[in-house]
Amino acid sequence: MYVVSTKQMLNNAQRGGYAVPAFNIHNLETMQVVVETAANLHAPVIIAGTPGTFTHAGTENLLALVSAMAKQYHHPLAIHLDHHTKFDDIAQKVRSGVRSVMIDASHLPFAQNISRVKEVVDFCHRFDVSVEAELGQLGGQEDDVQVNEADALYTNPVQAREFAEATGIDSLAVAIGTAHGMYASAPVLDFSRLENIRQWVNLPLVLHGASGLSTKDIQQTIKLGICKINVATELKNAFSQALKNYLTEHPEATDPRDYLQSAKSAMRDVVSKVIADCGCEGRA
């Protein structure tokens, strides 16, 4: 009942003019903070994990945790495969109970990207699983995948329509100037390109690389059709910096139940801000 597909979440966001944040989790504490904060704010959220996260924690363990926490807080949650590339890996996780998938074949030529994505869509839709795919490429690093800034490609609006129609995807991740990781300086987002994509594609649009973006930029992308905002690095940085600071100030600390509280508090601030920026408080 409480573990849901992202399709309805994002369709509701599209109709309501807000975005749903997708938080990449890396450990139990991150998931606790995201779910507790979302439940307190009655905000829809997506629990996202890269292949590395699923390998680290175990698919069955993550599914069990999401299900248990959704029931505990009486709060609907979606668990989402972020930047997955291998069909067999996706199929295994879908059969285990995952109901939302991002197949990332954006590094392939256009026709091959379509072919790879359509194969995943055809399989996933048999299980009522929603599928996101990316057209264009973001710079930066996600898991073990590194894309140099010079190799990053913006989404072509006309191709985006062809891509969406040919694959049957449920949401489209676009490249408009964001990158994975934190920014050394404020990025310049191509809002006119995003507006053009919105005119050609009637699907919920997804923005990756949102860590460190200004509130103004995030809210402008939502006005232009973004329905899902991905955040990963900002959570990791908040966690690790707070933990380092605490252990520096308290070198005698040995109990993780104590010294992880400062890290959880720092992440809670990030999650609350992202939910506010997305305008999704009270929408769950």
Curated annotation (Swiss-Prot):
Q: Where do the annotations place Zn(2+) binding?
A: H83, H180, H208
UniProt-listed GO biological process terms: D-tagatose 6-phosphate catabolic process; galactitol catabolic process
- One cellular component GO annotation, for this chain's record? cytosol
Name the active site residues: D82 (proton donor)
Mind listing the UniProt keywords for this protein, alphabetically? Galactitol metabolism, Lyase, Metal-binding, Zinc
Which PROSITE patterns does the record associate with it? ALDOLASE_CLASS_II_1 (PS00602), ALDOLASE_CLASS_II_2 (PS00806)
Pfam families, alphabetically?
Answer: F_bP_aldolase (PF01116)
> What does the entry comment about cofactor binding?
Binds 1 zinc ion per subunit.
**A Gene Ontology molecular-function term?**
zinc ion binding
Tell me if Zinc is a UniProt keyword of this record.
yes
Note the Gene3D superfamilies from the entry. Aldolase class I
Q: Which domain of life is it from?
A: Bacteria
* Complex and partners: Forms a complex with GatZ.
Q: Which family does it belong to?
A: Belongs to the class II fructose-bisphosphate aldolase family. TagBP aldolase GatY subfamily.
Know the name of this protein? D-tagatose-1,6-bisphosphate aldolase subunit GatY
The organism of origin for this protein: Escherichia coli O17:K52:H18 (strain UMN026 / ExPEC)
